[in-house]
Amino acid sequence: MSAGTKASELRELGNEELLAKLREAKEELFNLRFQAATGQLENHGRLKAVRKDIARIYTLMRERELGIETVESA
């Protein structure tokens, strides 16, 4: 993911792609936390950006679950 994924970009993705993005973001967050703990992290703002990306993905998934947002078929 880039410096921060926009919600509009995430809305264009299907459910499977969203789950893949979520897995990637969680893995990146784990790696960033590990780097921070060992003193190797240079960009601390990236932690915040990845956490927000994860929150955006969870929000979008919940909207779809409740029927607020529908999956657009391409």
UniProtKB/Swiss-Prot annotation:
Q: List the disulfide bonds.
A: none
Q: Which GO molecular function annotations are given, in alphabetical order? A: structural constituent of ribosome
| Identification of the protein by name | Large ribosomal subunit protein uL29
The record ties this protein, via CDD domains, to: Ribosomal_L29_HIP (cd00427)
Tell me its family. Answer: Belongs to the universal ribosomal protein uL29 family.
A matching Pfam family: Ribosomal_L29
User: Which species does the entry assign this protein to?
Assistant: Streptomyces coelicolor (strain ATCC BAA-471 / A3(2) / M145)
GN (gene name)? rpmC
Could you name the domain of life of the organism this protein comes from? Bacteria
Alphabetical UniProt keywords = Ribonucleoprotein, Ribosomal protein
What SUPFAM superfamilies would the database entry show?
Answer: Ribosomal protein L29 (L29p) (SSF46561)
Which InterPro entries does this one have?
Answer: Ribosomal_protein_uL29, Ribosomal_uL29, Ribosomal_uL29_CS, Ribosomal_uL29_sf
Name its GO BP terms in alphabetical order: translation
Query: What PANTHER family does the record tag this protein with?
Result: 60S RIBOSOMAL PROTEIN L35/50S RIBOSOMAL PROTEIN L29 (PTHR10916), LARGE RIBOSOMAL SUBUNIT PROTEIN UL29C (PTHR10916:SF0)
GO CC, sorted alphabetically, is: cytosolic large ribosomal subunit
